[in-house]
């Protein structure tokens, strides 16, 4: 990872398009972390230095195409309003560029002389982070930064914090003194972080700086700065600034959107047509398409007018805006994507009907699924090959993406781009669908409705507390159907982690649940093009799936934390769980779509006082 220098020559030698000098390499991270952990706008610590990952405005110059190839997922791109996606660059040691970073925070302290000031006042040599007055002692970046819920980021206002009652003669921070930071060592709390100034003001500690209104009470407002965007002007902002630890997860949280590649977009043809799609879409007749294809794909018989017409028809049929309007705006575009995937997972897509480039292979098992009828499970589907694209749409600060509206999402670039950074992963999985008539009958039980209503109320309260404006807070998706399917997916992943050879962290859930959907996909997905070796698909054969379900449900009847767990009125973050804990139903966070909330194993197996709330109670008592 490399920071952009203040002045960079774009002159070239001969025919080479590369700069004369390679930029200094600051460190490296895994490619997937550029989407999930160290994406645009995040802070990354490298040795004794700290940087913010730059925006993608200049990525067309710094991300080489051979290191950061273009990938396509038509359905997701259309919803996100872009043409394509790009993988973060996988740079070699000889690469002259890559993901750019910028130094942040700019305030540093010297552990030797305890001086606290802007890094430029230390006068360090170029590309070094040292105190020249202390024999090149490495400087320490500020532990504290300031952020707001609109995504702005700034240095902590140390001068204003220290001179809170003595700012008449130095309101702009020019009191003539030299600030310093020291640690008293009396405790590990903020009370031990002492700020002082040679101008004579009383020294203060950092205690209280993390209060929600601590900076607002001092008259400090958000300056609207976006240091990850080169040349970005400050924005007017009404949000209250908040103090955060530089390494806190609240400083940066990704807004990720994903989609599976499904027919007719999954056979490689859509990728070939991507550069020509806008032109093809403008044609009104088959003859125009045929003439264009003869010129654009001369000698390539795989691209036919019939195939293009099929894709054009599919695009119109799958238009999220069209379906949302049909449902009176009640369905989000992302839910439309899920419905399309659900329909394809239910219908299947056999390998024998497709070529080697097909990225979605979904077939029913060969054996009779009658053994699953007592569980209320419809015919499972074996997803022998899948491709998922996960795109970084934006990011949030302080409030998580779940409880934030789009108005609080921070952009990845100063000007809109026609692409977003993304990862593509390949894998396999098993799709499980429950009988909807059984679900509807079970969900009508007053006891079931009461348990879920309490969970939903707690989740709604949590979302409103986290939201800047409670009126804009999203509504909890908790329903009996969702909580049941979510908890079942969790216990089944835990069971398969013991039987399929994959750790729970290597498996993921993808839930399909609303009034018309009742299923989930458990899959393994890796960045390797080969995906995995069939161990998960084998678990979807009816006999093995029945055994796994029975074993998982038996395990769910007892938890090492019982009776506290099963009798808990509420548990988890914000009380958004009921009978669920790390000993029975929770998973690694990377495996769960809802961050380990909206879980209740009592809906699977019942409680000692009321077994009837369990959907699978008859299987367990048989």
Report residues per predicted region.
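Extended, well-ordered protein cores
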Residues: 2-162, 178-184, 191, 219, ...
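Covalent nucleotidyltransferase core used to form phosphodiester bonds in nucleic acids
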Residues: 162-173
């Amino acid at each position: 990872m490399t920071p952009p220098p203040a002045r960079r020559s774009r002159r070239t030698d001969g025919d080479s398009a590369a700069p004369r000098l390679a930029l200094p390499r600051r460190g490296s991270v895994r490619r997937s972390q550029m989407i999930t952990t160290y994406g645009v706008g995040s802070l990354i610590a490298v040795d004794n230095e700290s940087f913010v990952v730059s925006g993608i405005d200049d990525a067309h110059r710094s991300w080489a195409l051979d290191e950061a190839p273009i990938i396509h997922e038509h359905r997701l791109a259309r919803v996100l309003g872009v043409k394509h996606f790009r993988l973060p660059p996988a740079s070699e040691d000889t690469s002259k560029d890559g993901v750019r970073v910028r130094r942040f925070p700019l305030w540093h302290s010297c552990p030797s002389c305890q001086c606290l000031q802007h890094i430029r006042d230390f006068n360090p040599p170029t590309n070094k982070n040292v105190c020249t007055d202390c024999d090149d002692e490495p400087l320490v970046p500020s532990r504290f930064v300031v952020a707001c819920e609109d995504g702005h980021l700034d240095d902590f206002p140390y001068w204003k914090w220290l001179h809170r009652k003595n700012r008449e003669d130095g309101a702009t921070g020019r009191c003539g003194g030299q600030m310093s930071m020291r640690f008293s060592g009396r405790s590990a709390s903020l009370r031990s972080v002492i700020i002082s100034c040679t101008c004579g003001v009383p020294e203060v500690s950092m205690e209280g700086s993390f209060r929600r209104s601590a900076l607002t009470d001092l008259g400090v407002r958000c300056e609207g700065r976006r240091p990850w965007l080169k040349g970005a002007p400050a924005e007017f902002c009404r949000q209250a600034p908040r103090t955060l630890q530089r390494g806190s997860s609240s400083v940066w949280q990704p807004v990720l959107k994903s989609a599976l590649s499904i027919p007719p977009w999954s056979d490689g043809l859509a990728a070939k047509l991507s550069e020509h799609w806008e032109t093809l879409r403008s044609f009104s007749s088959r003859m125009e398409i045929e003439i264009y294809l003869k010129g654009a794909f001369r000698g390539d018989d795989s691209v036919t007018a019939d195939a293009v017409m099929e894709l054009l028809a599919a695009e119109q049929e799958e238009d999220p805006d069209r379906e949302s309007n049909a449902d009176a705006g009640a369905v989000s575009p992302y839910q439309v994507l899920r419905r399309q995937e659900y329909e394809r997972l239910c219908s299947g897509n056999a390998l024998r009907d497709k070529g080697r480039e097909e990225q979605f292979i979904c077939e029913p098992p060969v054996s009779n699924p009658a053994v699953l009828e007592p569980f209320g499970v419809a015919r499972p589907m074996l997803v022998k090959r899948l491709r998922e694209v996960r795109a970084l749409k934006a990011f949030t600060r302080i409030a998580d993406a779940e409880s934030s509206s789009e108005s609080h999402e921070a952009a990845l670039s100063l000007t809109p781009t026609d692409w977003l950074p993304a990862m593509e992963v390949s894998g396999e999985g098993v799709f499980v669908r429950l009988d909807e008539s059984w679900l509807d009958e079970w969900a009508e039980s007053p006891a079931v409705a009461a348990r879920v209503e309490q969970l939903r109320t707690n989740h709604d309260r949590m979302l409103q507390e986290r939201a800047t404006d409670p009126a804009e807070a999203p509504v909890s998706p908790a329903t009996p159907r969702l909580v049941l399917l979510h908890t079942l997916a969790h216990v089944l992943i835990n069971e398969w982690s013991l039987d399929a050879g994959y750790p729970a962290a290597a498996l993921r859930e993808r839930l399909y649940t609303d009034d018309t959907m009742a299923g989930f996909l458990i899959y393994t997905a890796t960045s390797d093009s080969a995906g995995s070796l069939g161990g998960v698909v084998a678990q979807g054969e009816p006999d093995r799936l029945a055994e796994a379900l029975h074993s998982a449900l038996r395990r769910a009847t007892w938890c090492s934390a019982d009776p506290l767990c099963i009798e808990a009125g509420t548990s988890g973050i914000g009380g958004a769980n009921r009978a669920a804990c790390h000993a029975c139903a929770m998973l690694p966070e990377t495996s769960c779509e809802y961050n380990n909330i909206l879980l209740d194993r009592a809906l699977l197996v019942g409680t000692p006082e009321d077994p009837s709330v369990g959907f699978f109670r008859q299987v367990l008592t048989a």
